[in-house]
């Protein structure tokens, strides 16, 4: 039975009882209250149908079960709103008083996103996916009490990452349920970034919030595209979009990315599967004392075992060999080591306590990217304190950058949120002086398709934690 039919039946029932029993006006109102009560119960039942999409499925210890029960606090539930509106409509129609009927609104109320801290008041956030280290030489770490003790000394650091990861899971869940073809890139970026701001309870601060500009690269554009103000680009049904989201808490950056497609014929399935499996392989191979070359070789073997058919032609899926995973430092997204996605001979080892972004890119094109297009991504270079800004305007802009972003990456839209206007000339001066680094979009050949998946991993002394893992990828 539909909701509308149920309401009508409820109204008829109330009126019939009122006629039979000759109820007074206040009795009628009491009956209506009971009806409202039943409708509210129905609303509650509908709301409880939501699952915990933001949590990590693999962990079923008591702490995580306690924490994960709060994940639905701010989920939108349109059906809840429909039922609540219906209950209110019954209340108006069932009254014996001659009241002017209120026009029903078709707008559905959306629950306001609230800080993640309200869901986890004790400050303990869900852990990621735990994986054993593969090397036999590391087996002693799993049982060593000393190793576990050393790990506990960094609990605050790990909780910062876990908080950022939980925000990331919620933001990407909202993005996946909301993004549709026809939206502009500006609309998509605002949706994602405003969600981060709401969950983190921060706008542009060095305490928590956006870790880097939201990447929304389409098709042959592999990375480093986010819209500048005035960009009219819209998402098309046949576009393959890489969504790269960064969230930081006290400078601990969670860097995780996924690829979205809206084409219903499954033509992108092969490249999506190839890149997702390649990233999972990189995560599996990573660990303390593992050589970076060995990770790249394993990723390459998986990625290049796939091919993709487009318009009757078969294309091998290639690793984009000049894109890599990377070390993550406090407030520094690319810190020191790079994790190749092809065998490159790098014998450098991963070390205990390090944090890495394991990301892979697959392409139907050349498997090599070059900078092209209008720049939107920027970051302050380190060790530039001795360089004098070339003008007063450049000095003013540098102060704005340092106070709002530090060494975190940012984009033009973020500058404008701080109140900066007519800043492009000063910005270019800072770039030319080497104080600020620009990161233009990087692209493979036109007509090709690229995909990306990425996770942040923490190398604990005894195990590795895939902190950004979720039910989705």
Swiss-Prot record:
UniProt-listed SUPFAM superfamilies: Creatinase/aminopeptidase, Winged helix' DNA-binding domain
A GO MF term: initiator methionyl aminopeptidase activity
CDD domains: MetAP2
Stretches with biased composition (Low complexity): 84-93
EC top class named in words: hydrolase
Annotated Acidic residues bias: 73-83
Cofactor binding annotation: Binds 2 divalent metal cations per subunit. Has a high-affinity and a low affinity metal-binding site. The true nature of the physiological cofactor is under debate. The enzyme is active with cobalt, zinc, manganese or divalent iron ions. Most likely, methionine aminopeptidases function as mononuclear Fe(2+)-metalloproteases under physiological conditions, and the catalytically relevant metal-binding site has been assigned to the histidine-containing high-affinity site.
Catalytic activity: Release of N-terminal amino acids, preferentially methionine, from peptides and arylamides
Comp. bias (Polar residues): 41-53
Classification via Pfam families: Peptidase_M24
Cofactor or coenzyme needed: Co(2+); Zn(2+); Mn(2+); Fe(2+)
Binding site for a divalent metal cation 2: 255, 326, 359, 454
Major localization class: cytoplasm
Residues bound to a divalent metal cation 1: 244, 255, 454
One of the GO biological process terms: protein maturation
Keywords, comma-separated and alphabetical: Aminopeptidase, Cytoplasm, Hydrolase, Metal-binding, Protease
Binding residues for substrate: 224, 334
GO CC aspect terms: cytoplasm
EC number: 3.4.11.18
UniProt feature, compositional bias: Basic residues: 97-113
Region: Disordered, residue numbers: 23-121
Subcellular location(s) per record: Cytoplasm
General function of this protein: Cotranslationally removes the N-terminal methionine from nascent proteins. The N-terminal methionine is often cleaved when the second residue in the primary sequence is small and uncharged (Met-Ala-, Cys, Gly, Pro, Ser, Thr, or Val).
Stated family: Belongs to the peptidase M24A family. Methionine aminopeptidase eukaryotic type 2 subfamily.
Name this polypeptide is given: Methionine aminopeptidase 2
């Amino acid at each position: 039975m539909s909701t509308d039919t149920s309401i009508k039946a409820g109204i008829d029932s109330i009126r019939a009882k009122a006629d039979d029993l000759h109820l007074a006006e206040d009795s009628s109102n009491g009956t209506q209250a009971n009806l409202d009560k039943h409708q509210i119960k129905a609303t509650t039942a509908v709301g409880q149908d939501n699952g915990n999409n933001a949590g990590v499925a693999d962990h079923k210890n008591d702490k995580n079960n306690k924490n994960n029960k709060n994940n639905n606090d701010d989920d939108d539930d349109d059906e809840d709103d429909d039922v609540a509106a219906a209950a209110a409509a019954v209340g108006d129609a069932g009254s014996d008083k001659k009241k002017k009927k209120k026009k029903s609104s078709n707008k559905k109320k959306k629950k306001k996103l609230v800080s993640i801290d309200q869901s986890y008041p004790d400050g303990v956030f869900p852990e990621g996916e735990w994986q054993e280290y593969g090397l036999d030489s590391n087996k002693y770490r799993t049982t060593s009490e000393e190793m576990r003790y050393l790990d506990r000394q960094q609990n605050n650091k790990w909780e910062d990452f876990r908080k950022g990861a939980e925000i990331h899971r919620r933001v990407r869940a909202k993005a996946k349920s909301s993004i549709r073809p026809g939206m502009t890139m500006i609309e998509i970026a605002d949706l994602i970034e405003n969600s981060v701001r709401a969950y983190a309870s921060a706008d542009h601060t060095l305490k928590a919030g956006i870790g880097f500009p939201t990447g929304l690269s389409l098709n042959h554009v592999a990375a480093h595209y986010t819209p500048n103000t005035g960009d009219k680009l819209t998402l098309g049904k046949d576009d393959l979009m890489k969504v790269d989201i960064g969230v930081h808490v006290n400078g601990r950056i969670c860097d995780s990315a996924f690829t979205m497609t809206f084409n219903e014929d499954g033509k992108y399935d092969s490249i999506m599967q190839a890149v997702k499996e390649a990233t999972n392989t990189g995560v599996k191979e990573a660990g303390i004392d593992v050589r970076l070359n060995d990770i790249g070789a394993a990723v390459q073997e998986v990625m290049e075992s796939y091919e993709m058919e487009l318009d009757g032609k078969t294309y091998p899926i290639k690793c984009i060999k000049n894109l890599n995973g990377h070390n993550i430092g406090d407030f520094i997204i690319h810190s020191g080591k790079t994790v190749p996605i092809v065998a490159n001979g790098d014998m450098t080892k991963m070390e205990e306590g390090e944090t890495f972004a394991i990301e892979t890119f697959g392409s139907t094109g050349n498997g090599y990217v070059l900078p092209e297009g209008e720049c939107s991504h920027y970051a302050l270079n380190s060790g530039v304190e001795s360089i004098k800004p070339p003008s007063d305007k450049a000095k003013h802009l540098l102060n704005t950058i340092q106070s709002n972003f530090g060494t975190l990456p940012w984009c033009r839209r973020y500058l404008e949120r701080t109140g900066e206007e007519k800043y492009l000339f000063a910005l270019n001066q800072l770039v030319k002086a080497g104080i600020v680094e620009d990161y233009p979009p990087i692209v493979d050949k036109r007509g090709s398709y690229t995909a990306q998946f990425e996770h942040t991993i923490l190398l604990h002394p005894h195990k590795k934690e895939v902190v950004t893992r979720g039910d989705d990828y």
